Amino acid sequence: AAGVYVSGGTGITILGNSIYSNTGQAIDLGTSGVTANDAGDADSGANNLQNFPVLTSANSNATGTTIDGTLNSNANTTYRIEFFANRPSIADATNGEGERYLGFITVTTDGSGNASYNTTLANVWVNSGDKISATATVDLGGGNYGSTSEFGANITASSTGIIVVDTTSDVSDGTTSSITNLGAARGADGRISLREAIAAANNTANGGTPDKIVFNIAGSGTHVINVASALPTINQALIIDGLSEPDYAAAPIV
C-alpha cells in the first residue's frame, strides 16, 4: 500500500514528513500508481493530480547540498518544493520516497507554468549514492498551503569530500575503498558507521583539502558510539564535525 493515499478531493497538504519502506509508493494521488506530469498541469483528480518536481542534480560539499531542478505546473503560481533523501537500500526504483526531510524552497512559475531552481541547503548533507526526490505543494500565502504532488523521480546524489554517519553502530561491513564506493555499498545494515567513514576517507586521496565527516543519527537523546577497538588512524586531511548532528546539545564529547 502507499504511504499516503489521496483517494479524492483537493487541497490535501503533505509537508515535512518521513515516508518510506512502504509496499507501494510514498504518496499516491488516485489509484493509478505514479501519475505522469502533464504540460501546464491542466488535468484533474485527487489533489488536481499536482505535477511533481523534476530534479537534475544533487551534490553535497563542505557548505551543504546543492540541488538543481525544474517544475512545470499552473502558470503564475507559487509552490513549496520539499527535498528528501533516501538510503539506496530503501529507495523506490523510480519515483522517490521521503526517508529524510532535507528542507524546502519556494518558487513561482512564469506565464508558461515553468520554474527552475539551483539552491543550496546550507549545513544539510547527503551521502554519495543517496536517492534524492522532491514534492511540490501549492503555496497559498500566509503560511497556508494547498495540494501536494506525488514524489518526483529519484536522482542519485554525489558528494565532494562529505560522508554522513547515520548510525551509532561500530560495524564495518561496507566497501571502504573510497568515499564514493562506501556510498554505493554500505553493507548489510545499509548505514555508514564512524569506523567505515574514517576508513573510506583514508582511502580517498584529497590532496590536502580536508574531507568532512558529519552526523545525522536518527532518534532523540544522547547518541553514544561505543567502539570495540581503536578507530583507524587518520592519514588524510579530515574534519570530524560533531556539531553537525541536528539534535546535538551542549558540546559533543569525544
What name fits each language-model region?
Residues 2-254:
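N-terminal, post-signal-peptide segments of secreted/periplasmic proteins
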